[in-house]
């Protein structure tokens, strides 16, 4: 059987539970046609670069699929019919990547705390107080007539 990565975008106005229902529906289609679904990642609600069918946001989902080609064709056929699916893309891969996808790694990196929690400033020490800056001499102004 061939290996595929399948990403689909669902409408913004459906609930996360409905997105999970769509995932289960398509998992059932793949398993009924002799395939299996490996990793499923829900990337959440993200902004679209441009509007698709009057939607500015979409729920993104990634599925790793190990299935024969007819199973993938059936999933794509059902996604074309479903009004909740805005876009989908299926790519044949040589092997599935281990661990989280690049999008999930980015989310984990973005979730790290910033500012005070980042650690010391090495040998520079804390930042000095800048005061109200009135202690500096004023720059001479040219009077315009």
Curated annotation (Swiss-Prot):
Binds together with bS18 to 16S ribosomal RNA. GO terms for biological process: translation. CDD domains: bS6. Coiled coil: none annotated. GO terms for cellular component: cytosolic small ribosomal subunit. Keywords: Ribonucleoprotein, Ribosomal protein, RNA-binding, rRNA-binding. This is Small ribosomal subunit protein bS6. Belongs to the bacterial ribosomal protein bS6 family. InterPro entries: Ribosomal_bS6, Ribosomal_bS6_sf, Ribosomal_S6_plastid/chlpt, Transl_elong_EF1B/ribsomal_bS6. GO terms for molecular function: small ribosomal subunit rRNA binding; structural constituent of ribosome. Residues 94-145 are annotated as: Disordered. The keyword rRNA-binding applies. It holds the Pfam family Ribosomal_S6. The keyword Ribosomal protein applies. It comes from Sinorhizobium medicae (strain WSM419). SUPFAM superfamilies: Ribosomal protein S6.
């Amino acid at each position: 059987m061939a290996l595929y990565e399948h990403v689909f975008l669902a409408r913004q106005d459906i609930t996360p539970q409905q997105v999970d229902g769509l995932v289960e529906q398509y998992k059932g289609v793949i398993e009924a046609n002799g395939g299996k679904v490996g990793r499923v990642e829900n990337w959440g609600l993200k902004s679209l670069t441009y509007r698709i069918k009057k939607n500015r946001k979409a729920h993104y989902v990634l599925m790793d699929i190990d299935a024969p080609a007819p199973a993938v064709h059936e999933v794509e056929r059902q996604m074309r019919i479903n009004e909740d699916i805005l876009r989908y893309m299926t790519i044949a891969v040589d092997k599935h990547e281990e661990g989280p996808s690049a999008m999930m790694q980015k989310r984990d990196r973005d979730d790290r705390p910033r500012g005070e929690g980042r650690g010391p400033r090495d040998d520079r020490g804390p930042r000095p107080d800048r005061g109200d800056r009135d202690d500096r001499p004023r720059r001479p102004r040219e009077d315009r007539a």
